[in-house]
Curated annotation (Swiss-Prot):
Pathway: Isoprenoid biosynthesis; farnesyl diphosphate biosynthesis; farnesyl diphosphate from geranyl diphosphate and isopentenyl diphosphate: step 1/1; Isoprenoid biosynthesis; geranyl diphosphate biosynthesis; geranyl diphosphate from dimethylallyl diphosphate and isopentenyl diphosphate: step 1/1; Isoprenoid biosynthesis; geranylgeranyl diphosphate biosynthesis; geranylgeranyl diphosphate from farnesyl diphosphate and isopentenyl diphosphate: step 1/1. Isopentenyl diphosphate binds at residues 85, 88, 122, 141. Mg(2+) 1 binds at residues 129, 135. The keyword Transmembrane helix applies. It is found in: Host endoplasmic reticulum; Host membrane. This is Trans-prenyltransferase. Trans-prenyltransferase that catalyzes the sequential condensation of isopentenyl diphosphate (IPP) with different allylic diphosphates, such as dimethylallyl diphosphate (DMAPP), geranyl diphosphate (GPP), farnesyl diphosphate (FPP) and geranylgeranyl diphosphate (GGPP), farnesyl diphosphate being the best allylic substrate. Mg(2+) 2 binds at residues 129, 135. It comes from African swine fever virus (isolate Tick/Malawi/Lil 20-1/1983) (ASFV). Its cofactor is Mg(2+). The chain crosses the membrane at residues 1-21. InterPro entries: Isoprenoid_synthase_dom_sf, Polyprenyl_synt.
Length: 318
């Protein structure tokens, strides 16, 4: 099934890249939405985590209502997406917001489509992770896993649908920018770059999933950080620095989870190997390095204190 997903990603990616490189700057490659995902939401207003989470839930509900998922896959995809913490889309939206306080493109960017994409990719990976051929989990987020509720076949196809829809969301984000942000530099080129980067990150996540390493966690944070940076600044300048911040945060997130699962994990749990105390020290060091990078790029805002504390709370079991 993973091979089918990867082949489908490659085919879609080729089509997207051809579209971006052979069409005029203002050519749409996606159909317009029938609803406004972000009605009543202003992207430049400062927000706390709770407000961001509620706003993203509104965006998600609107996207599902607008038909992001079709037919028999609507219910399992919607089911899988409910009840998350939405930390990845919140990170993406906040980075875009912070960047726009320094960069103007003629109109504020609403990164709703990109935020949906990163959550879709992440949830697709969770569905696969829970499958009988991987972790064989029957519970997640205090409810049945997708395969346990809907069956293996629908779970597999739901993961594929989420992944494919995520790429369409990225394309829709670029189309929206082309229509609403006249000073955004070369959106077609950045759209092709983002799709290529995301494809590479998903491949890394898939490889990490097979051997159960932090590389199944970190790539999704790289997608959130880097898409946020590129959409917020309109450039790939310093993208390596932002990727480093994402790596530090993703590493802290995974190790905090290892501490939480110390007593139940049977695989290569870092905290089991090195001890909880040392692992917690690495979590704190990684978060501190991430903070330093974000401060250096002037995108460390008050909500990061909440985000970092959530990671610490996982490690502390609170």
């Amino acid at each position: 099934m993973l091979h089918l997903i990867y082949i489908s990603i490659i085919v879609v990616l080729i089509i997207i890249l051809i579209s971006y490189t052979h069409k005029p700057k203002y050519f749409r490659i996606t159909a317009p939405r029938s609803v406004t995902l972000f009605h009543g939401i202003h992207p430049l207003n400062p927000k706390n985590y709770k407000t961001f989470s509620e706003e993203f839930e509104t965006i998600l509900n609107n996207a599902i209502e607008d038909g992001d998922f079709k037919g028999q896959l609507t219910e399992p995809c919607s089911y899988a997406l409910r009840g998350g913490k939405y930390i990845r889309p919140i990170i993406l939206m906040e980075i875009v917001r912070a960047c726009q306080l320094q960069h103007s493109f003629g109109a504020p960017i609403y990164p709703a489509e990109a935020a949906l994409a990163v959550e879709y990719f992440h949830v697709a990976s969770l569905i696969i992770d829970d499958m009988p051929s991987f972790d064989n989990d029957v519970k997640r987020r205090n409810k049945d896993t997708v395969w346990a509720r809907f069956g293996v076949a629908k779970a597999q196809m739901s993961a594929l649908a989420l992944t494919m829809q995520g790429f369409q969301n990225i394309c829709r984000q670029i189309d929206w920018i082309k229509e609403h942000c006249p000073r955004f530099p070369d959106p077609n080129q950045l759209g092709a770059l983002l799709c290529t980067f995301v494809s590479h990150s998903l491949n890394s996540a898939g490889s990490g999933q097979l051997v159960d390493t932090p590389e199944k966690t970190i790539p999704f944070f790289k997608i959130a950080f880097i898409m946020g940076w590129v959409l917020g600044t309109g450039t790939i300048e310093d993208i390596g620095v932002i990727e480093r911040a994402a790596h530090c945060f993703g590493n802290a997130f995974q190790l905090a989870d290892d501490i939480k699962d110390h007593d139940t994990d049977t695989g290569g749990n870092y905290a089991k190997i090195h001890g909880k105390r040392k692992t917690f020290d690495v979590v704190a060091q990684s978060l501190q390095e991430c903070k330093k990078i974000l401060q250096g790029k002037k995108i460390y805002t008050s909500i990061w204190n909440e985000i970092f504390q959530k990671v610490i709370n996982v490690a502390l079991g609170t």
